[in-house]
A protein has these predicted regions:
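N-terminal carbohydrate-binding accessory modules
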Residues: 35-97
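The substrate-binding groove and active-site-proximal loops of carbohydrate-active enzymes
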Residues: 70-79, 102-120, 168-188, 274-291, ...
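Short, acidic/polar
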Residues: 77-93, 326-341, 357, 383-386
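Aromatic-lined substrate-binding rim segments of carbohydrate-active enzymes
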Residues: 83-157, 290-304
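Polysaccharide-binding and catalytic clefts of secreted carbohydrate-active enzymes
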Residues: 161-335
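Catalytic-core region of carbohydrate-active enzymes that cleave or remodel glycosidic bonds
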Residues: 296-306, 333-430
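Aromatic- and carboxylate-lined catalytic core of secreted/periplasmic carbohydrate-active enzymes
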Residues: 387-508
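C-terminal beta-sandwich/jelly-roll accessory domains of carbohydrate-active enzymes
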Residues: 469-478, 490-563
Length: 563
């Protein structure tokens, strides 16, 4: 029977006639539903897509907001059922709901025009058995700049499939984005993949997003010096990019605006005429052509099966020059070039092996770019950053790399944080983007965050500031993180670890703010269940709300005001 959330008795009591119609409607729907098999029912769902709510974008899966509690597999793990067999249970114990997994061009199309989907069909079935969703990573023309995952028939035919050249004329194992045959072959394989996903998974929706290529960028020079590239570099900057810059002149990111301004905001000319003669111009040139190439792939894929599709970037280091990092990739200082050249790309994502987390997230949310973190170092900061990114930035999700390397999954901090987010998911989904959710990220260098939520100012400090825990005396502090959700004027939920909160009234500063009630609990079937009522020493006699560093928990608290 199809279940309904309506309270039929209450509805009938309120209005007898409407109640009868409601009952008849529900009965008819139920009878009709019984005649549908499960696959037909699933066809009623929209395919996974992005939807705006307030200031954030939400990923909608099976018609509901879905936060990716993910983990990315190591590059070679998804190549056989046998290797994956012991990994699936570990992923479940980690409280993942999504696995980011590569699809390898070399395995998909070992001979030109002959595609083998058997491996991926079997792996999709294994994901279904474990109640896990998949984000496929298309290791096509480029993976970490290189073309190592291109099929052998592409690699050995260098005349047909040209490679990049550096400024000394040396070739590298990187397919040139200026080679038409490179694009045609990559695009054809991608189309075949999307067609098969639609046919095999179009009703189940196990595959919910696609990352197209992986960490695109030019190495070891800032631009490609292949004759095809040199010819394009001498041509005038395309009108398409110029029009984008003119239209968005006041809002393009300052890093790009400054490059354009140095030559007087010219609106026609070669790349060097407009942006100057330097490696930064070389990078802008590559960004344009990489984005156009990738957009062609994504546009073709979406025409077949329009899942959300994105690209990811290897972050550059401070003061490093293009070419010392993958030049022209989807990086924040050239994100407008990617937005102009890649309108079909849903968002640009950072891969984090860089400790300055807040800095890079702040850069990536510009230009209304949704934040998703497909890779993060599998380190002890990952749990805190996961909950912070979802709380503060409204991130679509979080995914540490080489997730299968976890040795003790059930006791892993990330597993505990994912469990908390999973329980809070209905609240997060309801209040995201509406100014009711915040996140905190705390360590010894940043031991305090001050938040304004409704009528209150919340001062959130690392629990080590209390001095109660032995590790508070350490030279460095373990990173703490949490999400805070305001569900009513005086009601809040906080989930995470390692914090202490005090309060002020923003509207009437002369009033004191008291803690009316604090409960520790959990959500079971989306219903709040109290485990402990906290008071006395656990709230410092009503002075604060706290959870110690290793106390991964959810607290519900109410505030009140007094003279």
């Amino acid at each position: 029977m199809i279940k309904t959330d309506f309270d039929i008795a209450r509805l009938c009591k309120k209005n007898h006639f409407i109640g009868i119609l409601a009952v008849l409607s529900i009965i008819c729907s139920s009878l009709y539903g019984q005649n549908l098999n499960s696959k037909q029912e699933q066809k009623l769902h929209q395919i996974p897509h992005l939807k705006k709510q307030g200031t954030v974008s939400q990923l909608i899966v099976d018609d509901k907001p879905f936060i990716i509690l993910g983990g990315e597999l190591g590059n070679s793990s998804f190549t056989s059922l046998e290797y994956m067999h012991p990994i699936w249970p570990k992923l479940k114990k980690m409280n993942l709901n999504t696995v980011l997994a590569p699809v390898y061009w070399e395995l998909l199309e070992p001979e030109e025009g002959k595609f083998d989907f058997d491996l991926y069909d079997q792996l999709i079935n294994e994901a279904r058995k474990n109640n896990l969703k998949l984000v496929f990573l298309w290791f096509g023309a480029w993976k970490n700049s290189m073309s190592s995952h291109a099929p052998a028939w592409v690699k050995i035919d260098q005349k047909r499939f040209p490679r990049v050249k550096d400024n000394k004329g040396k070739s590298h194992e990187i397919l040139s984005p200026f080679g038409e045959e490179n694009l045609k072959a990559d695009l054809k394989a991608y189309e075949a993949l999307m067609k098969h996903i639609k046919e095999f998974d179009g009703t189940e929706n196990t595959v919910i997003m696609i990352q197209t290529e992986n960490e695109i960028g030019m190495l070891p020079t800032a631009r490609d010096y292949h004759p095809l590239a040199n010819k394009k570099f001498q041509e005038n900057v395309t009108v398409e990019l110029i029009n984008y810059l003119k239209k968005n002149k006041k809002v393009i990111v300052p890093e790009l605006s400054e490059r354009w301004a140095k030559n007087g905001f010219k609106e026609s000319g070669t790349w060097e005429d407009i942006f100057g003669k330097n490696v930064h111009t070389d990078e802008i040139f590559m960004a344009w052509h990489y984005s156009k190439y990738t957009n062609s792939i994504i546009e073709a894929g979406k025409a077949i099966y329009a899942l959300p599709m994105f690209v990811n970037a290897a972050l550059n280091r401070t003061d490093s020059l293009p070419g010392s990092y993958p030049s022209g990739g989807p990086l924040p200082h050239i994100m407008d070039v990617w937005k102009a050249g890649g309108p079909s790309i849903d968002f640009l994502s950072p891969d984090f092996y860089n400790p300055n987390f807040k800095h890079w997230c702040d850069l990536y949310i510009r230009q209304q770019n949704p934040l998703f973190i497909p890779e993060h170092s599998l380190d002890k900061t990952a749990a805190a950053k996961a909950v912070y990114s979802i709380g503060h930035y409204g991130a679509l999700g979080f995914s540490p790399f080489s997730i299968e390397d976890i040795n003790d999954p059930e006791n892993e901090p990330l597993a505990k944080i994912y469990n908390i987010i999973k329980q809070l998911n209905p609240l997060i989904s309801a209040y995201q983007g509406l100014g009711k959710i915040e996140g905190v990220l705390l360590d010894k260098e940043t031991p305090m965050n001050v938040l304004k939520m409704g009528n209150y100012e919340l001062t959130v400090k690392h629990s080590y500031t209390l001095g109660y825990e032995k590790d508070s005396k350490n030279e460095t502090w373990d990173m703490a993180g949490a999400i805070i959700i305001q569900t009513a004027e005086n009601e809040f939920y906080v989930g995470g670890s390692g914090l202490v909160i005090t309060f002020k009234n923003l509207i009437k500063p002369d009033l004191n703010v008291g803690i009316l009630k604090v409960d520790e609990g959990k959500f079971e079937s989306n219903k709040w269940k109290v485990i402990r009522h906290l008071n006395g020493d656990q709230t410092h006699q009503g002075r604060h709300v706290r959870m110690m560093y290793n106390d991964y928990s959810i607290l519900r608290f109410e505030l009140y005001n007094y003279d």
